[in-house]
Amino acid sequence: MINRLNRLCKKNILNNILNNNKNVSNRIINRFYCNLNTTNLKINNDNNLKESIREKIKDIPSLNEFLRNSNNEINENNENKSKIETEEEYELPPYLSSLPNDKGNGRKVWIETYGCQMNVSDEEVICSIMKSSGYTISNDFNTADIVFLNTCSIRENAEAKIWLRLTELRAIRRKQGRPNLIVGVLGCMAERLKEKLLESDMKVDIVVGPDAYRSLPSLLATLEDGEQQTAINVILSADETYADIKPVRKSDNQVSAYVSIMRGCNNMCSYCIVPFTRGRERSRPIDSILREVKDLSDQGFKEITLLGQNVNSFNYYEESNNNNNENFIDTQKNKLELESLKPREGFKTIYKSPKKGITFTKLMELVSKVDPEIRIRFTSPHPKDFPDDLLELIKNQPNICKQLHIPAQSGSSKVLESMRRGYTRESYIELIDTIKRVLPGCAISSDFISGFCGESDQDHNETISLMEYVGYENAFMFMYSLREKTHAHRQLKDDVPTTLKNSRLTQVVDTFYKRLKEKNQLEIGNHHLVLVDGFSKRSEKDFVGRTDTNKKVLISNDIENQDIKVGEYYIVEIIKGDSEVTLKGKPIMKSSIQHFNNIYNHKNKFI
């Protein structure tokens, strides 16, 4: 059975996915993985354990196979159909069998999330899955029966934190008398280091990749029933978006929320591990996105951030099966025409162009109309996917924030080519200039990597000059960390010494904060619409909120401001801007997005 499933996985499944047999294909893949778990990864204390793990994990279809087969134009539909029909006669193994909602029996789950906003969103999905199976999400680590580490693999330091935490958990099990504590590693690190995690002496009980969270209750059931001591599911799905799962929101104040609109990435930048840990791009059904936004609006949320690894390459092209006529969504959607997703002029891709579909610009238009009083942000985009019509939409829709993340990574065309970013310094600057012309005062943020393979002093200086030219409002700056499996790991040489990487990173950080402080000084006297989202972490004497441009503003919680409430919009005058991080503001009046837009109309004191 295993050999037959193995052959199917490696030769036929991905072609079937292309021929609209996704559900059948995924069931067969899942059978392969789950039989791999239940039959071949039972953990015994014998000397053959590590070899057994290696032998079985190497049979898992690789991402290269995934990509290669997904671009295959040969139609093998008839040949594959008979094979799949034969395999359909087999019943699903217990690993994927549906569980009753009370299977968790109230056992307490503690989740620690590391890394990006997508991981935060994934945690909310995991919470929903666990609660629906009868588990309780715990707010107290000390009472938890199960601990999940929701991990990041983007840099070596991110993984080092997890190894340290696993060491701590191993000690807690031993020294605090909690030998039955179940420890699971979820997310990108689980996908990337599945073999190492299972072979280590950290006593990891469960390893689950980003596309396999639905199987968590089943995996736990096999552990709790004593069927095996370790369970793994690290399948990369061609269509999993968790669209039907209602996230359990983790926000305490119910002001802002994340909405995941797509998963995976096709860009294959030479330094990046994301395509190997999260798979290929797939867009979530548009109706489900708009319903979630409407639900958040009904709950009183005031700000939504649309999420994706490459969010503005959203391209939904499947027909909707939803025949519900009671909502605004279907009526609007049916008016949309499918469009080709093409990179901006001066930018290029290394992958095959997708089918015509509903693009990110059209999605943003629909989302912005669900509730004109909800702010809309999005992250993380790619510079190639900023067409002019998207910029015009942002300009004309008051509730789409005038704050764009435009990851540069480097200011050197030579380094950008080595990174396989698909653009030059000149084309990036052209995009920035266009944004500044179409959206005056728009805040721009970015990502930068210092010390990439082959980076010279001149390359580094070009990055510094780009930062000085643009004047970023926020930046995520890191030293290059070589990741296995990436193009850089296979083809390039990590030849910049660590000390030089550090010194260059220091200069990058210093340049950013110098320009930011200059820009903050220019804010004094400007009026912004600030959404108050809580109190300052340093002192409850100050409210804290954010402008449309995502600048943090402190407002004194004094006698004059007793009417200020969390979750409301206020017009605020900036009175102090000497901090590198926050501004100080004085509230003028309570307002709304539409009211503020009518008063200022993006002119006068508003940036």
UniProtKB/Swiss-Prot annotation:
PROSITE patterns listed in its UniProt record: MTTASE_N, MTTASE_RADICAL, RADICAL_SAM, TRAM
Cofactor note: Binds 2 [4Fe-4S] clusters. One cluster is coordinated with 3 cysteines and an exchangeable S-adenosyl-L-methionine.
Domain TRAM per the UniProt entry, residue ranges: 521-589
One GO cellular component, as annotated: mitochondrion
Function text: Probable regulator of CDK5 activity.
Family from the record: Belongs to the methylthiotransferase family. MiaB subfamily.
The protein, known as: CDK5RAP1-like protein
Gene from which the chain derives: cdk5rap1
